[in-house]
Amino acid sequence: MSFFKKLAASAGIGAAKVDTILEKDAYFPGEEVQGTVHVKGGKIAQDIRYIDLQLSTRYVIVKDDEEHRKYATIHSFRVTGSFTIQPGEEHQFPFTFTLPLDTPITVGKVEVAVVTDLDIQGGIDKSDHDRIFVEAHPWIENVLEAIENLGFRLNEADCEQAPYFQRRLPFVQEFEFVPTSGYYRQMLDELELIFLLDEDGLEIIFEVDRRARGLRGWLEEMYNDGEQLVRVRFSQSELEDTEELEEVLEEILDQYAE
């Protein structure tokens, strides 16, 4: 084996390559993700220590009044352990995993990616980065449609650091809506929602920002920011009955719009 080929491969030139192909591009939390990791040998035989997959995103942290973005691993697992790949040889490793229920929806500034790490012994590791589209879980989709029917439009969505929630991940995804028509346009400035999904149902955290109305409203907003925070849990049956769901959401908003 050429000394220079060895040297080049250790520097990543002519080394094995990795490419991960997913069965499809879009998934929703709780759905099974299937795909295959393709590895092709380079110009020399190489020992592969392992192949790992990570599901990752970025979230906002505020430090010294400045916003920064930090990576977070949503899920990770080992696809395979050690093996040797010969020059030009091809290997395929199928995999399956369930998209975690707390995976953020890819809307607004939120991105989610499957990152493949090919660990090469004595060489530079290779990686593959595949963005995926994460759709809303059907229960959350029903809530979003109901909120839209009540006259709200999604203005912004992002993942923000939230250690006080004591969740598995260091962040929560926040959805910011603005009223565009109807009663709430006169009563509210904005509505922020956080969805905490599990197998049995959905907890929604509402942050309602009331519009200041006259001197009393202005003074109230000055002292407590005009915001009201409420947590409500919905069962599976409540989330699947779209008419009842919209009525319940309207009742909640009416309490805090007055």
Swiss-Prot record:
InterPro entries: Arrestin-like_C, Ig_E-set, Spore_0_M
SUPFAM superfamilies, sorted: E set domains (SSF81296)
Function: Controls the expression of spo0A and is required to pass the morphological stage 0 of sporulation.
Keywords: Sporulation
Family membership noted in the UniProt record: Belongs to the spo0M family.
Induction per the UniProt record: Expression controlled by a sigma-H-regulated promoter which needs the sigma-H factor for the binding of the RNA polymerase and subsequent transcription.
Annotated Pfam families: Spo0M
A single BP term in Gene Ontology: sporulation resulting in formation of a cellular spore
Protein name: Sporulation-control protein spo0M
